[in-house]
């Protein structure tokens, strides 16, 4: 997971910079294309070339599969080119996707639209996207030792949750009442990120990541990741597997046989770890910019990969073919951090949308289109910056108010801010 960049604009900047960093390995095709388009957008806008700026914004819109951020960018270019009707259509799409961003709309490029009656009407509709909605309740609040809780999973045999902490650099074991004990500390003292419980084999898989530029990790280690296997009963570290160079293995799912599938939100790779040999195999062909938590499908051949920037993709594990699920101008599919599949239902934690939200999508079968969506939680005092979740029985449990939004890009507290009290929320999803 690109853990420092919750808002999509920040992700764009961070990944563009990473693609140009001299010590980075050759960029995968998607990151390279993204960097080129981002640079071209800046160049054409600064030069005042309205036609070239519009053409590039259209290319970016296509590349990002009609994401909300790309819609706003294209709206800006259409307004700049004097195409008010097209710009207002794009604005209506942005709002139809449940988005609201008053700050972005203060940009000078939108000045020609503000006095138009249709703009005012759409702007009024946008305000409704800020209204609070919730079908969730607080299960327990996390203790202060859970400093930036990141991932969560559950062991049905012991009825315990396991929660990774970024600044705490720990995995915590928590019961349904919120009673907490230390399960394991990061062996390299890097932030603990992804985790998954393999209840059948009685092991827990996790990752620790020395995020680039992150003060909580030694500078000499920046850009390194490790996949860790623990004995679930004792907390003993069984294996430590060094990740690929310059990879941030921040998100994880388990294949049917228990093999971890991990994603690198910094450089675009999706990998499978062989649980027996500890070998690492790349699963994708470079189509992703910032892949997050994959969802393994029942057929064993496909996984759904949420790209924080490009949206939601179906990846064929045999051929590496990627098919993007269309937004159809109605569904925000970018900005997903955690993704969880239940037959044709997807549960997503979206901390890269505006506003942030937890949402349920219903897909067709096969999974090629979104049929409907419904909000689980949005714009509430309890939600804050949500990260990941886990389905337990009929309920979805998820981390809310994680605290990422009060940290700067180096993982230090923003001036005047303090870490919030994080919670585990619960909503019925079946």
Region annotations inferred by a language model:
Residues 130-172, 420:
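Beta-strand-rich domains and repeat architectures in extracellular enzymes and scaffolds
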């Amino acid at each position: 997971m690109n853990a420092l960049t919750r808002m999509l604009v920040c992700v764009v900047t961070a990944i563009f910079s990473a693609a140009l960093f001299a010590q980075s390995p050759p960029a995968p095709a998607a990151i390279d294309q993204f960097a080129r388009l981002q640079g071209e957008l800046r160049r054409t806008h600064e030069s005042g070339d309205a036609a070239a700026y519009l053409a590039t914004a259209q290319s970016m819109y296509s590349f990002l599969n009609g994401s909300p951020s790309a819609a706003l960018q294209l709206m800006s270019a259409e307004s700049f080119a004097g195409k008010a009707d097209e710009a207002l259509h794009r604005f209506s799409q942005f709002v139809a996707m449940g988005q609201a961003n008053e700050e972005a709309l203060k940009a000078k490029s939108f000045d020609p639209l503000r006095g138009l009656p249709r703009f005012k009407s759409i702007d009024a509709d946008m305000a409704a996207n800020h209204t609070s909605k919730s079908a969730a309740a607080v299960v327990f609040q996390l203790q202060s030792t859970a400093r930036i809780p990141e991932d969560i999973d559950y062991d049905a045999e012991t009825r315990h949750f396991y929660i990774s902490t970024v600044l705490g650099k720990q995995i915590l074991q928590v019961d349904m009442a919120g009673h907490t004990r230390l399960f394991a500390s990061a062996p390299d003292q890097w932030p603990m990120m992804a985790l998954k419980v393999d209840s059948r084999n009685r092991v827990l898989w996790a990752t620790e990541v020395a995020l680039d530029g992150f003060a909580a990790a030694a500078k000499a280690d920046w850009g390194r990741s490790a996949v860790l296997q623990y004995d679930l009963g004792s907390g003993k570290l069984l294996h430590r597997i060094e990740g690929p160079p310059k990879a941030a293995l921040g998100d994880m799912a388990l294949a049917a046989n228990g093999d971890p599938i991990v994603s690198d939100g910094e450089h675009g790779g999706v990998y499978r770890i062989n649980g027996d040999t500890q070998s690492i195999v790349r699963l994708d062909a470079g189509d992703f910019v910032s892949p997050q938590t994959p969802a393994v499908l029942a057929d064993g051949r496909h996984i759904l990969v949420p790209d924080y920037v490009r949206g939601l993709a179906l990846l064929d594990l045999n051929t590496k073919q990627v098919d993007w699920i269309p937004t159809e101008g109605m569904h925000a599919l970018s900005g997903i951090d955690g993704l969880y599949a239940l037959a044709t239902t997807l549960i997503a934690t979206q901390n890269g949308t505006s506003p942030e939200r937890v949402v349920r999508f219903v897909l067709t079968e096969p999974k090629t289109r979104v049929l409907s969506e419904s909000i689980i939680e949005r714009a509430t005092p309890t939600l804050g910056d949500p990260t990941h979740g886990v389905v337990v029985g009929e309920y979805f449990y998820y981390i809310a108010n994680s605290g990422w939004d009060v940290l700067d890009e180096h993982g230090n507290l923003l001036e005047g801010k303090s870490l919030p009290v994080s919670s585990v929320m619960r909503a019925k999803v079946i």
